[in-house]
Amino acid sequence: MRALAIIASIALGVPVDEKDDLEQLLANGKAALRAGKIDEAASAANQAVQRAPKDARGYFLRGLVRGAARKSTEAGADFGKCIELDPKLADAYQQRGGEYFKLAKIDESLADFDKFLELRPDERPGHWQRGIALYYAGKYKEGAEQFKAGDKVFADDVENAVWHYLCNAKVVGADKARAELLKIGTDKRVPMMVVYDLFAGKAKPEDVMAAVEKGKPKESEMKSRQFYANLYLGLYYDSTGDKKKAREHLEKAGADPNVGGYMGDVARVHLSILRP
């Protein structure tokens, strides 16, 4: 978990005699968060903040914990405190941008992602979260450019190609966007290659669901398959103007907050925009 590694790199701002206790609290909190022990991680993070209120690491850890607990407003405030303490802390902008997105605060999310890239320009080609934020901000041309750049990073990722299509279709129309669909290698996740064919005009929605049912996947694999199928069928139907079917699939995709990670949040944000 890259975000946890960031904590170790933030400069200390505590007296020497408190350093060992603080280091232990941060280590305990990171370990608990990795293990999914949210309450234990929250306790360690709160103690770290109390022990060293001018050290950004405690707030960063607590922001991660609150984000994991789906407390995006509180998480965003913690990352904001990190930025107040260290305006050059790029990863705090990245994390806060993600929390803003979950709250459907698209403009604020995009501003933070842009600030992150101002500080870390080398990350620009692979910043797919920014591309998605651009889509929801209505900046479709910029979004298409972001995902086009991502083609060099995600050569085997159907999602990058689909999001390029979704942005590009808003600019040049569906037919031309389909003709300009980014070429990819092989995305091994089921049913992503069928999803690719769907947006390429070579498959039907029922083909995507049929792919989900193939074989005898374990429960966790089946949940993943169903999630991606419902997410991209929802986005597909929305792109064709069928809001009813889009809602049906996006409701299924966003139903379980423990499935889909950030893309689950995308499903929920999109659904919130579709609802009257």
Where do the PLM segments sit?
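Structural marker of alpha-solenoid helical repeat scaffolds
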Residues: R51, L85, L119, V153-F154, ...
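Position-specific recognition of the canonical hydrophobic site in helix A of tetratricopeptide repeat
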Residues: L33, F60, G67, Q94, ...
